[in-house]
UniProtKB/Swiss-Prot annotation:
<feature type="disulfide bond">
    <location>
        <begin position="296"/>
        <end position="320"/>
    </location>
</feature>
<keyword id="KW-0449">Lipoprotein</keyword>
<keyword id="KW-0261">Viral envelope protein</keyword>
<dbReference type="GO" id="GO:0020002">
    <property type="term" value="C:host cell plasma membrane"/>
</dbReference>
<keyword id="KW-1032">Host cell membrane</keyword>
<feature type="disulfide bond">
    <location>
        <begin position="59"/>
        <end position="292"/>
    </location>
</feature>
<keyword id="KW-0812">Transmembrane</keyword>
<keyword id="KW-1162">Viral penetration into host cytoplasm</keyword>
<dbReference type="Pfam" id="PF00509">
    <property type="entry name" value="Hemagglutinin"/>
</dbReference>
<keyword id="KW-1015">Disulfide bond</keyword>
<keyword id="KW-1043">Host membrane</keyword>
<feature type="topological domain" description="Cytoplasmic">
    <location>
        <begin position="551"/>
        <end position="566"/>
    </location>
</feature>
<dbReference type="GO" id="GO:0046789">
    <property type="term" value="F:host cell surface receptor binding"/>
</dbReference>
<feature type="glycosylation site" description="N-linked (GlcNAc...) asparagine; by host">
    <location>
        <position position="304"/>
    </location>
</feature>
<keyword id="KW-1170">Fusion of virus membrane with host endosomal membrane</keyword>
<dbReference type="GO" id="GO:0019062">
    <property type="term" value="P:virion attachment to host cell"/>
</dbReference>
<feature type="glycosylation site" description="N-linked (GlcNAc...) asparagine; by host">
    <location>
        <position position="28"/>
    </location>
</feature>
Length: 566
């Protein structure tokens, strides 16, 4: 019996050998990423690609303030609605802001022809030079320029009119034919606006213009149109039964525009020499204007971010991330974060990389843990860690660079007659948005899968590197660990880590210990067989005795009748 106990003690002692394990870093990160095959994978490190925050303010764009129209809209501002006098001196802006209650547009009722196209043109204008195209005091000597006012465009309680147009009426009892031209010598496009008045009755036509069969003609090299007043009774709007239609054209440099009329002309007084700017645009927002600066503005607020995607608003001004419908776009840079339970087993062994990462290893992504007579400790493999960091950093930067095409995205303008086109445009935009969102999400899923596989591969490569050095001088015990058949001090451990392990030096000692341990295993197997047989016999005897006792008790109290027949 003493010999068998000695064999068991030898078996226990043989397992308390020097060990080295390969593992990876873990930390307390709660970052999660999605891959093609998994969702919410916790990782040690990750980068966010999706901006979802803004400051709730309208800011300067690259140092240039926006033009907030307040209660006025584009029409009221350009025509010069008296309610928009605060905007008369506005000449430059980074972007134009209308609000949800921008009601002051055309004060005298009528249609603004091609208004949506004009708004579209202004989306690329960053400033203009406002000038008198036809000076009021000298351009119309044979026509009245002061009596053309209306209660519909009142100012300070008195009848008034648009600040940038002149309502020409008859002078005395005549309205002689007028013809006035302007040559664009500004060296840039000039925006010219005018109107045509449509009285409700012939009496009004005569009292204003004298001529019953009046006309208005406007012509340039690219624009040529003749208008005749449509005299008809109409429901009153703003207490006006008449109507005014408003028109505009862009006059190219060097081109000439000519106005000819015998009545009903709302003549241009001021025009605008336009300066184009690719970063401008028109947005609708009720956010307040602040003294702040940004590179990207949305109707909800400014975005200060270098990320490639945002889910704040599809309408943007400036250098902005691409809008996607995603709620999460996080790219993994680190490893799966599965911290191991640092409990010690029978011989003080730690968990290896299969069971989880090491929070104790903080100076690298991959590395080693050793245990010998001199103690235990962690050591990162700096070379493989640095190679991985460089590779992943380059990949992340490449993805951000390729996807980070920042630009302005403003809505397109359609009038009431173009609703089918507008609906089709929305469907097309939605389709592109879905494609962008799908591509962004798929890119992140694929790259996350590749990154995590890349880390797994690096750990396996490190494991194979150690295995190829040790050969049969150590055995694999699972969990990414090797148990040496020889004593391995700190210098020996370092040689394994740096790839200079001297296999022949330890091979003889390993051979002897390996044979001794194999012998102990064979002997211990005999002990285990004896113990197993003894256990089986003992349990069988206990079962038989128990059955006999139960039967005797049941016979004695009549619960069981025993009959013996001969």
């Amino acid at each position: 019996m003493e010999a068998r106990l000695l064999v068991l003690l030898c078996a226990f002692a043989a397992t308390n050998a020097d060990t080295i394990c390969i593992g990876y870093h873990a930390n307390n990160s709660t970052d999660t990423v999605d891959t093609v095959l998994e969702k919410n994978v916790t990782v040690t490190h990750s980068v966010n690609l999706l901006e979802d925050s803004h400051n709730g303010k309208l800011c300067k764009l690259k140092g240039i303030a926006p033009l907030q129209l307040g209660k006025c809209n584009i029409a009221g501002w350009l025509l010069g609605n008296p309610e928009c006098d605060l905007l008369l001196t506005a000449s430059s802006w980074s972007y134009i802001v209308e609000t949800s209650n921008s009601e002051n547009g055309t004060c005298y009722p009528g249609d603004f022809i091609d208004y949506e196209e004009l708004r579209e043109q202004l989306s690329s204008v960053s400033s203009f030079e406002k000038f008198e195209i036809f000076p009021k005091t000298s351009s119309w000597p044979n026509h009245e320029t002061t009596k053309g006012v209306t209660a519909a465009c009142s100012y300070a309680g008195a009848s008034s009119f648009y600040r940038n147009l002149l309502w020409l009426t008859k002078k005395g009892s005549s309205y002689p034919k007028l013809s006035k031209s302007y040559v664009n010598n500004k060296g840039k496009e000039v925006l010219v606006l005018w109107g045509v008045h449509h009285p409700p009755t012939g009496t009004d036509q005569q009292s204003l213009y004298q001529n019953a069969d009046a006309y208005v003609s406007v012509g340039s090299s690219k624009y040529n149109r003749r208008f005749t007043p449509e005299i008809a009774a109409r429901p009153k709007v703003r207490d006006q039964a008449g109507r005014m239609n408003y028109y505009w054209t862009l006059l190219e440099p060097g081109d000439t525009i000519t106005f000819e009329a015998t009545g009903n002309l709302i003549a241009p007084w001021y025009a605008f020499a336009l300066n184009r700017g690719s970063g401008s645009g028109i947005i609708t927002s009720d956010a307040p204007v602040h003294d702040c600066n940004t590179k990207c503005q949305t109707p909800h607020g400014a975005i200060n971010s270098s990320l490639p995607f945002q889910n704040i608003h599809p309408v943007t001004i400036g250098e902005c991330p691409k809008y996607v419908r995603s709620t999460k776009l996080r790219m993994a840079t680190g490893l799966r974060n599965i911290p191991s339970i640092q409990s010690r087993g029978l011989f003080g062994a730690i968990a290896g990389f299969i069971e989880g990462g090491w929070t104790g290893m903080i100076d690298g992504w991959y590395g080693y843990h050793h245990q010998n007579e001199q103690g235990s400790g962690y050591a990162a493999d700096q070379k493989s860690t640095q190679n991985a960091i460089d590779g992943i950093t380059n990949k992340v930067n490449s993805v951000i660079e390729k996807m980070n095409t920042q630009f302005t995205a403003v809505g397109k303008e359609f009038n009431n007659l173009e609703r089918r086109i507008e609906n089709l445009n929305k469907k097309v935009d939605d389709g592109f948005l879905d494609i962008w969102t799908y591509n962004a999400e798929l890119l992140v899923l694929l790259e996350n899968e590749r990154t995590l596989d890349f880390h797994d591969s690096n750990v396996r490569n490190l494991y194979e590197k150690v295995k190829s050095q040790l050969k049969n001088n150590a055995k694999e015990i699972g969990n990414g660990c090797f148990e040496f058949y020889h004593k391995c001090d700190d210098a020996c451990m370092e040689s394994v880590r740096n790839g200079t392990y001297d296999y022949p030096k330890y091979s003889e000692e390993s051979k002897l210990n390996r044979e001794e341990i194999d012998g102990v295993k064979l002997e211990s197997m005999g002990v285990y067989q004896i113990l197993a047989i003894y256990s089986t016999v003992a349990s069988s005897l206990v079962l038989l005795v128990s059955l006999g006792a139960i039967s005797f008790w049941m016979c004695s109290n009549g619960s069981l009748q025993c009959r013996i027949c001969i």
